Amino acid sequence: MSEQSAQSVYHRSEQLLKEARKSHRGVFLTGPNKIEILTDELPESSFEGDYFITASLGNCRCASDAKAIRQFDAHARVPSGADRIALGHETLQIILQAPEGSNLKKGELVVITPGHSSEPIDPLEFKTVSDGVLAALGYSYRFLGGLRQFNRIPSAAPEFVRSQGFGNLFNPVSPKENTSLISLAHAEPFACNYGTNKHIFTLDENGNFIYGVPPRSIVTYLSGTARMAMINLTIVASVADEDLPNVVYVTGSKSKLDEMENYALVNDLRNRGTRVVLVDRKDPDILNKLTEFGKSDVVWTNYASQETYNQAVA
């Protein structure tokens, strides 16, 4: 980043920090199947130096939000008795205030890791308590979520999250002129899929584990027309031609599959030698269609049901 750009970002961060002291709006979960746009304020103590203050720049909708929306505080990550929870866990933020010694500075862009605790904690202070909650971004906090304008995070949070096995709370990104903020917010679902693929295992001829999607394998995406499946397939396709899957099966609704016929990703895979087979999930002959060019080595799905299990083991 040029010196002029850095000064501009710093100046904008100063402006936003002043705005963060005022009332501002956010999208909050306030009950089962109840979402409201509300005005809120960060506590004045947030600006005394022991908190990170951030501004939300981008957020991606995730299907896993739906479960929290349906269940509210019956959800394991939503505190019991909460009156409002800020939604949004796939988010890009800009640092407006950082505690001394934090290694972050005003104006930095960061993606926030969504998983925060593997044991019950007080979500306001990031301290373990017996009656706490398994805290996570977009599920557990009033003052932190990608769909509120300004956020506060205790200074102890980064080290606590690291100690819980979730890695870095803040993940700095380097913006480029041709990269949109929404694209950067996709870093979180991309990381989910990258991690999933890295830890997939198959068995070799000797019965040993082989981690990762094997070269020249047959990969199936059941109900695979959604965004997460396409991100996963993008990662699978990011290898040399000789390591691409031989066959990729994708099931979904006919309307979605018709759209996929024109996807650049699908056309690129076909041009590079992968057979991409799109199968209507309502096809009565679906089990035969999913084995027409060989049985699957790897099956990906977001939907655990008897139907998808039958398709996976076909």
Which stretches of residues belong to each language-model region?
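Glycine-rich beta-strand-centered segment in the early N-terminal region that forms part
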Residues: P43-N59, D73-L124, A157, G167
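Short Gly/aromatic-enriched secondary-structure transition segments
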Residues: A66-A74
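N-terminal glycine-rich dinucleotide-binding loop that anchors FAD/FMN and/or NAD(P) in oxidoreductases
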Residues: H75-A82, G138-R142, G146, L265-L278
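Extracellular beta-rich ligand/substrate-recognition surface
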Residues: G26-E36
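Glycine-rich cofactor phosphate-binding loops and adjacent beta1-alpha1 units
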Residues: L203-V219, S223, M228-M230, T234-V247, ...
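Short structural boundary motif marking the start of a folded domain
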Residues: Q7, Q15-V27
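NAD(P)H dinucleotide-binding glycine-rich loop of Rossmann-like/cofactor-binding domains
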Residues: V78, S117-R216
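Receiver (REC) domain switch-region micro-motif
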Residues: V110, V161, V299
